[in-house]
C-alpha cells in the first residue's frame, strides 16, 4: 500500500514537472527575451548636469524677488552673478534689516559684506540639495523622453553621486538621441527691447535686468528683458502644426493662470516684439498684433522631424540644467550579433562538456543531473522572459556560472548518496538520506549567492546589473531543479530499476 502511494506521488510530481516545463517553454517562445546594448547594438551615454547654470538661475530668481522686496530700502542696485546676488547699498545702517528680509525669502543663505556691497550666497548644504534635486529631475525627464521615443528596454540609471548612464538598445541615430536627451528645452517668452546685427550696439543699452541673446542662425542679436513672461513650466501641451506658409511648426497651449497672465501682457504690449527663446537662442520674434491668451506657435524653419522632436521635448518638460556628454559609445548590430554567437557557442560547449563529465562519472544518475541543469536554464530563461528582464553578455556569463553551481550541487548530493550506499543502506534510503544530509550545505550556497546577487544589482550598474539579474534568477531556478526535481528523477530511475551511480 505504501509502495503504491509512493509511486502515485512520484507520478504526480512528474506531471507537475511536465506542466511547469511546458509553461516555461511557452513563456520563452511567447515573450522573447529583451537583448541588452552589448547584444542588440545601440548607443550609450554618460552624462553629468552642468550645475553652474542651474545655480546661476536660482540666483537670478532670488535677485528678481529681492528687487521688489527691497524697494523700500536705500538700495542702489540688486543683480545676480554666478557667485551670488550683489546688493549695492546706499545706507549701510540698513544692512541688518535687509538681511532679515532676505532670510524670510530664503533662509538657506549666508552673507558677505564687501564695502558698500552685500553679497548673498547659498549655503553649501542648500547647494548640495539643489544638485541632488537636479540629478533626480534630470533622470525622470530623460526617462520620459526616451519612453516617448519607443525604445525597448532603455536603461537610465544613476552612476556615482552626480552622473547618469543612458543605454538605448537598438537605437543607432546618435545625433537625434543626443538632441532629444541633451536639449534643456528651456522655453521662455521675453519682451524684446531692441534688435541689431551688431552686439556692441546693444551692449550700450544693457542693464542688470536685461540680457543679449543670439538668433537661432546667429545673424542677429536681441536685447530682451531677463524676466520671462512665460516659461516651459507654463505649458499645458505642445504638438506639431504648420505656420502660415505651410511649414512645420510647434503649437502650444498654456495652463489657466499662465494664459490669464499672458493675455494681460500681450494686451499691454501690442505693437512690440515678443522673443520666443529656446535653449538661450531666439527662434522667432513676432510682433504682438492683438491680445493672445491660451495658445501660441513656435516657428523657425523646422524640418518635420525637428518639429516632432521639439514638441516631444516640450511635452516632457525642460531639464533643470544643461547636460554634459562625458562619454558616448556606439555598439553596432554586427558587434552585437558576434557577441550573441560567441555566447551561444560558449554555452553549447559548456553544456556538452558538463554532460560528458557527469555521465562518465555518475552513469545514469549523471543523466538526471543533465536534465536538472537543462530545466535550471529553461526556468531561468522563462523567468527573464516573463519579468521582462534584459539579457546582456555578462548575463550569459551568469547563466554559465549557474550551470557550474548546479553541477556542484549535484556532485555534492551524488557523492553523499554513494557514501550512504557504502554504509549498507538501500538505494531508496540512500537517496533519501543523501538529499536530507546535503540540504543545509546546498541551501547555504544558494542563499549566499542570492544575497551577493542582490548586492551587485543594488550597487552595480550596466553590465554588473545584467550579471546580477541572471545570477539571482538562476540561483532560485537552480535550487528548485537540483533539490526537488533531481530527487524526483533519481526516484524514477530507481523505481524503473535502472539507476546506476
Curated annotation (Swiss-Prot):
Matches recorded under Pfam families: Sec_GG (PF07549), SecD_1st (PF21760), SecD_SecF_C (PF02355), SecDF_P1_head (PF22599)
Gene Ontology terms, MF aspect: protein-transporting ATPase activity
Role: Part of the Sec protein translocase complex. Interacts with the SecYEG preprotein conducting channel. SecDF uses the proton motive force (PMF) to complete protein translocation after the ATP-dependent function of SecA.
GO CC aspect terms: plasma membrane
Major site of localization recorded for this protein: membrane
Residue stretches in coiled coil: none
UniProt cross-references to HAMAP family, sorted A to Z: SecD_B (MF_01463_B)
Entry keyword annotation includes Transmembrane helix: yes
Keywords (A to Z) from UniProt: Cell inner membrane, Cell membrane, Membrane, Protein transport, Translocation, Transmembrane, Transmembrane helix, Transport
Gene3D superfamilies hit by this protein: 3.30.1360.200, 3.30.70.3400, Multidrug efflux transporter AcrB transmembrane domain
Quaternary structure note: Forms a complex with SecF. Part of the essential Sec protein translocation apparatus which comprises SecA, SecYEG and auxiliary proteins SecDF. Other proteins may also be involved.
Name of protein: Protein translocase subunit SecD
Native source organism of the sequence: Aquifex aeolicus (strain VF5)
Amino acid at each position: 500500500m505504501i509502495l503504491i502511494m509512493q509511486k502515485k506521488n512520484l507520478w504526480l510530481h512528474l506531471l507537475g514537472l511536465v506542466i511547469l516545463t511546458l509553461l516555461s517553454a511557452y513563456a520563452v517562445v511567447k515573450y522573447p527575451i529583451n537583448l541588452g546594448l552589448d547584444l542588440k547594438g545601440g548607443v550609450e551615454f554618460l552624462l553629468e548636469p552642468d550645475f553652474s547654470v542651474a545655480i546661476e538661475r536660482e540666483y537670478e530668481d532670488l535677485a528678481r524677488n529681492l528687487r521688489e522686496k527691497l524697494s523700500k530700502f536705500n538700495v542702489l542696485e540688486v543683480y545676480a552673478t554666478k557667485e551670488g546676488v550683489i546688493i549695492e547699498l546706499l545706507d549701510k545702517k540698513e544692512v541688518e534689516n535687509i538681511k532679515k528680509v532676505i532670510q524670510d525669502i530664503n533662509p538657506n543663505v549666508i552673507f558677505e559684506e564687501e564695502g558698500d556691497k552685500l553679497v548673498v550666497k547659498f549655503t553649501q548644504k542648500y547647494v548640495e540639495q539643489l544638485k541632488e534635486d537636479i540629478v533626480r529631475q534630470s533622470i525622470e525627464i530623460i526617462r520620459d523622453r526616451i519612453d516617448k521615443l519607443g525604445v525597448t528596454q532603455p536603461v537610465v540609471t544613476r552612476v556615482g553621486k552626480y552622473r547618469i548612464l543612458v543605454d538605448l538598445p537598438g537605437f543607432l541615430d546618435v545625433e537625434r538621441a543626443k538632441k532629444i536627451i541633451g536639449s534643456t528645452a528651456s522655453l521662455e517668452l521675453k519682451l524684446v527691447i531692441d534688435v541689431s546685427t551688431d552686439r556692441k550696439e546693444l551692449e550700450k543699452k544693457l542693464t542688470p535686468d536685461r540680457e543679449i541673446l543670439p538668433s537661432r542662425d546667429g545673424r542677429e542679436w536681441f536685447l530682451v528683458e531677463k524676466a520671462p513672461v512665460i516659461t516651459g513650466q507654463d505649458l499645458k501641451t505642445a504638438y506639431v502644426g504648420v505656420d502660415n506658409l505651410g511649414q512645420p511648426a510647434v503649437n502650444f497651449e498654456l495652463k489657466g493662470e499662465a494664459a490669464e497672465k499672458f493675455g494681460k501682457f500681450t494686451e499691454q504690449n501690442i505693437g512690440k516684439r515678443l522673443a520666443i527663446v529656446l535653449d538661450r537662442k531666439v527662434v522667432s520674434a513676432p510682433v504682438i498684433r492683438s491680445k493672445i491668451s491660451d495658445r501660441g506657435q513656435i516657428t523657425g524653419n523646422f524640418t518635420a522631424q525637428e518639429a516632432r522632436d521639439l514638441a516631444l521635448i516640450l511635452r516632457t518638460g525642460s531639464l533643470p540644467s544643461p547636460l554634459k556628454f562625458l562619454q558616448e559609445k556606439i555598439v553596432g548590430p554586427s558587434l552585437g550579433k558576434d557577441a550573441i554567437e560567441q555566447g551561444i557557442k560558449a554555452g553549447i560547449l559548456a553544456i556538452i562538456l558538463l554532460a560528458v563529465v557527469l555521465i562518465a562519472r555518475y552513469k545514469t544518475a549523471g543523466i538526471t543531473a543533465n536534465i536538472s541543469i537543462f530545466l535550471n536554464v529553461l526556468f531561468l530563461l522563462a523567468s527573464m522572459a516573463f519579468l521582462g528582464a534584459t539579457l546582456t553578455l555578462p548575463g550569459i556569463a551568469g547563466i554559465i556560472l549557474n550551470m557550474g553551481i548546479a553541477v556542484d550541487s549535484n556532485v555534492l548530493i551524488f557523492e553523499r548518496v554513494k557514501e550512504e550506499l557504502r554504509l549498507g543502506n538501500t538505494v531508496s534510503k540512500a537517496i533519501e538520506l543523501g538529499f536530507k544530509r546535503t540540504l543545509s550545505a546546498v541551501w547555504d550556497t544558494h542563499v549566499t549567492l542570492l544575497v551577493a546577487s542582490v548586492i551587485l544589482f543594488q550597487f552595480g550598474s550596466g553590465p554588473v546589473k545584467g550579471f546580477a539579474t541572471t545570477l539571482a534568477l538562476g540561483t532560485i531556478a537552480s535550487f528548485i531543479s537540483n533539490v526537488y526535481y533531481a530527487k524526483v528523477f533519481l526516484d524514477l530511475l530507481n523505481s524503473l530499476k535502472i539507476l546506476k551511480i
